[in-house]
């Protein structure tokens, strides 16, 4: 017999490496789709104004507003709406968790 002993060892754990790769790929996908602008941009083949703006030269003048907002709309309205919905949801959940119970007094004449 040989003096070399074979010990049983568990297989290497690759879960942390797989988790790191999955997080990296997920972050790359989210960044790619959040930073790419897919809407058609106004303008001509030389002057592109995808986020609105103005351009003026000797022969032409271009004025485009932002594609998401008109000239009279506020940019804070969606944020305020989200906060209002969250607040209403929390209010309803608080009311559901703490229902109003009638007050019972210890007075025998009041019951």
UniProtKB/Swiss-Prot annotation:
Primary site of residence: host cell
Keyword hit for Membrane: yes
Location relative to the cell: Host endoplasmic reticulum membrane
InterPro entries named among the record's database cross-references: Plant_vir_prot (IPR001896)
Gene Ontology annotations of biological process type: transport of virus in host, cell to cell
Matches recorded under Pfam families: Plant_vir_prot (PF01307)
The keyword NADP appears for this protein: no
Record topology, Cytoplasmic segments: 1-16, 94-111
Bilayer-crossing regions: 17-37, 73-93
Lumenal membrane side: 38-72
Cellular component annotations (GO), alphabetically ordered: host cell endoplasmic reticulum membrane; membrane
Keywords tagged on the record: Host endoplasmic reticulum, Host membrane, Membrane, Transmembrane, Transmembrane helix, Transport, Viral movement protein
Other information: TGBp1, TGBp2 and TGBp3 seem to act together for cell-to-cell propagation. TGBp1 is the main movement protein that physically cross the plasmodesma with the viral genome. TGBp2 and TGBp3 would facilitate TGBp1 function.
Family (UniProt): Belongs to the Tymovirales TGBp2 protein family.
Reported function: Plays a role in viral cell-to-cell propagation, by facilitating genome transport to neighboring plant cells through plasmosdesmata,.
The protein's name in its UniProt record: Movement protein TGB2
Organism of derivation: Papaya mosaic potexvirus
């Amino acid at each position: 017999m040989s003096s070399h002993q074979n010990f049983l060892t568990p297989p290497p754990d690759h879960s942390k490496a797989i988790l790191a790769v999955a997080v990296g790929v997920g972050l790359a996908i989210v960044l790619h789709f959040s930073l790419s602008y897919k809407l058609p941009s106004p303008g001509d083949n030389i002057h592109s104004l995808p986020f609105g703006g103005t351009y003026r030269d000797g022969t032409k003048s271009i004025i485009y507003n932002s594609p998401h907002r008109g000239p009279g709309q506020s940019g804070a309205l969606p944020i305020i709406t989200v906060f209002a919905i969250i607040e209403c949801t929390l209010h309803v959940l608080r009311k559901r968790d703490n229902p109003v119970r009638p007050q019972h007094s210890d007075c025998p004449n009041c019951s």
